[in-house]
Amino acid sequence: MIQMQTNLDVADNSGARRVMCIKVLGGSKRKYAHVGDIIVVSVKEAIPRGRVKKGDVMKAVVVRTAKDIRRVDGSVIRFDRNAAVLINNKRAQSWDQTIALSIARRNEGYTHSQHSNQREGGERIQAQPSPPHARRAVKTSFCR
């Protein structure tokens, strides 16, 4: 669960290393964000020649949380740290980003087309289980 003042790691190559949540989007009374939710963040730490600078305010999609994620089959997914991917105001990335992450929720609509669990015709693809330590570098655009 991500709330205001939560520090998150950045899981892309935008140049930001650490961000802080300043608002959870989705209603005036909404307190917590989970995997797949959009939040407003402030960049707290960035590399010197990155695309973003310290103090920039951007939107981000939460991709990993330390809170348990329960799946319908009864399995539980948990990460060591909270992480997010920076996006622009139109819910798409403003540049090509390489993201190293394990996809925690495939049904949120924020996964790359080659990693989604549904084909164009609507038939479901049987997802192959991957070990929890497996990480993939994915070139994506986060559009619904």
Curated annotation (Swiss-Prot):
Quick check: keyword Metal-binding in the entry? no
The organism's superkingdom is given as: Bacteria
**InterPro entries, A to Z:** Ribosomal_uL14, Ribosomal_uL14_bac-type, Ribosomal_uL14_CS, Ribosomal_uL14_sf
GO cellular component terms given for this protein = cytosolic large ribosomal subunit
Subunit structure comment from the entry: Part of the 50S ribosomal subunit. Forms a cluster with proteins L3 and L19. In the 70S ribosome, L14 and L19 interact and together make contacts with the 16S rRNA in bridges B5 and B8.
Described by its record, this protein's role is as follows:
Binds to 23S rRNA. Forms part of two intersubunit bridges in the 70S ribosome.
HAMAP family, from UniProt? Ribosomal_uL14
Q: To which protein family does this belong? A: Belongs to the universal ribosomal protein uL14 family.
Q: Kindly provide the name given to this protein in its UniProt entry.
A: Large ribosomal subunit protein uL14
Q: Look up and give the organism this protein is from.
A: Xanthobacter autotrophicus (strain ATCC BAA-1158 / Py2)
Name of the gene encoding the protein in the UniProt record: rplN
